[in-house]
Amino acid sequence: MSVIRPLGLSDRLIVEDYLRRYPPEISELTFTNLYVWRHSRRIFLAEIEDSIVFVTNTGEEGDGGNFVLGHPVGGASPLSVVNALGIEVAGLIRVPKNTADTLRNADLLVTTDRDNSDYLYRVTDLAELAGRRFHKKQSCQAVPCSV
């Protein structure tokens, strides 16, 4: 069983090292993002099979809650991580498509959460903002602020 510990500021260098060696496919997977959100959703980490894994507890402090796993950063498979953690895991979140396909092939239920999907836009589409598709972005006004 691997040691799971709360994410702390002292973990910054090790997390950034893993993210540098294994660039994530999920845009929100940065140390800063994880650290900022650690109070609203308790985030833990563990090192397993030369990978780092982030675990979120959806419950309140003292409440058991559900443990939800992020995609491992490194070479470990999500299934081997679940076995190594030795805890009951309610699910995995924000996994790349190839991992989702692997989980489907293992007869696990996989659902797409479009509200948390990363989106890609063509540079020319954003530069021109042509058509109704970009109407809300066209009417956005940038207002400079002073500090």
Task: Name each model feature, range by range.
Residues 1-27, 126-147:
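Short amphipathic alpha-helix that is part of the acyltransferase structural core
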Residues 10, 41, 114-117:
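Sequence-level motif detector for i,i+2 pairs with an aromatic at +2
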Residues 14, 27, 31, 115-117:
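A general marker of short, structured functional hotspots
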Residues 17, 28-98:
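Conserved donor-binding loop and adjoining core beta-sheet/short helix segment
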Residues 22-25, 33, 47, 64, ...:
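Generic alpha-helical propensity signal that fires on short helical segments
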